[in-house]
């Protein structure tokens, strides 16, 4: 059974049904299905954890307290067969409240203003700068305000008032939890949450790999933890050092903290053996298995690599007391980005033309 409270409860029910004595009944659990880990688990059995069993029973009671009261109401108001639960009912309310806030929001008008600037010195190139304001950042709320600024600066000579150069650091994303895996698989692979979990289950339970037999390729995929075992972290760091060199190998291992309230019962989702590279076993996987395994493998490896470095330049140009700003960043050192770049629902920054 799964290494969680539901799996613990199933084990307890089996023990009770079979009439097995507590003192001679043991449970073996593991988070990855590999020969080494399974043998270690068999060598270290434990008794059934009644705290986990009680937690499952409490969850079951709460499901019924909520579901038995709300489900009949749904049948009356909407249609029969609908169900309600302790999680989905609250989540539905939060979604509805948010939708009400969106509908009641009074939209405000915002304008942006860009200036295409070119240095007087020829053959240097053009770049785009965004309107900033005068002494402090100013928002433009109407076409009239935009036209007023344009009438003032159009055709005027801009003077560079400030240039700032700095090195920026970008750190890798943490390893996957269940929710972040579903989000990233949707963004990058176009897979639904349900399909993501189905394919992850296949990778966890095991795939026939040429020369290896049936191998569980990833750890347990239902987790809210960012924790990694010391053994897995050491294996990743050793792989990074051998494959990419010292520059990509940070001085010490990265440790990620779980969010407040996380159960932290299992490790983060990671490959069970980092040396099984996606492209080397691609022929043994389906297209979906390969894509999802590569996503998990890359994210795990990247989370233990050096930070990426950028050279950032911000230029401020002024005309008639109005300031415009342009920012551009060049990748100086790829770091973890040599392996993996986290997806975004929306671009964090607008693409800027290179600065001369």
Model features per residue range: what roles?
Residues 1-356:
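Toprim catalytic domain recognition across nucleic-acid enzymes
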């Amino acid at each position: 059974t799964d290494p969680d409270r539901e799996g613990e409860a199933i084990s307890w029910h089996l023990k009770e049904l079979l009439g097995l004595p507590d003192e001679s009944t043991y449970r073996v659990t593991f988070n990855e299905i590999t020969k080494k880990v399974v043998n270690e688990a068999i060598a270290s059995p434990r008794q059934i954890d009644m705290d986990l069993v009680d937690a499952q029973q409490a969850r079951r009671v709460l499901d019924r307290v909520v579901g038995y009261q709300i489900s009949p109401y749904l049948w009356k108001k909407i249609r029969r067969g609908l169900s309600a639960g302790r999680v989905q009912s609250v989540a539905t309310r939060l979604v509805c409240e948010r939708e009400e806030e969106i509908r009641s929001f009074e939209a405000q008008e915002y304008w942006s203003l860009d200036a295409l600037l070119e240095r007087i010195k020829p053959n240097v190139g053009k770049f785009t700068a965004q309107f900033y304001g005068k002494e402090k950042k100013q928002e433009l709320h109407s076409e009239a305000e935009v036209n007023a600024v344009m009438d003032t600066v159009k055709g005027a000579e801009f003077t560079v008032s400030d240039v700032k150069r700095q090195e920026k650091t970008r750190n890798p994303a943490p390893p996957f939890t269940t929710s972040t895996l579903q989000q990233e698989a949707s963004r990058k692979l176009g897979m639904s949450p349900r399909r993501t979990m189905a394919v992850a289950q296949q990778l966890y339970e095991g795939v026939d790999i040429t020369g290896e037999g049936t191998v569980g390729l990833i750890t347990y995929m239902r987790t809210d933890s960012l924790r990694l075992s010391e053994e897995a972290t050491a294996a990743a760091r050793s792989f990074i050092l051998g494959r990419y060199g010292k520059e990509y190998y940070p001085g010490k291992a990265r440790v990620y903290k779980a969010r407040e309230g996380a159960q932290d019962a299992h490790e983060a989702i990671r490959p069970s053996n980092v040396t099984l590279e996606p492209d080397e076993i691609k022929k043994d996987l389906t297209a979906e298995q390969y894509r999802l395994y590569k996503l998990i493998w890359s994210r795990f490896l990247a989370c233990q690599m050096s930070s990426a470095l950028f050279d950032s330049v911000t230029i401020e140009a002024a005309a008639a007391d109005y300031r415009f700003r342009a920012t551009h960043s060049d990748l100086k050192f790829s770091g973890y980005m040599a392996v993996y770049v986290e997806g975004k629902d929306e671009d964090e920054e607008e693409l800027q033309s290179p600065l001369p």
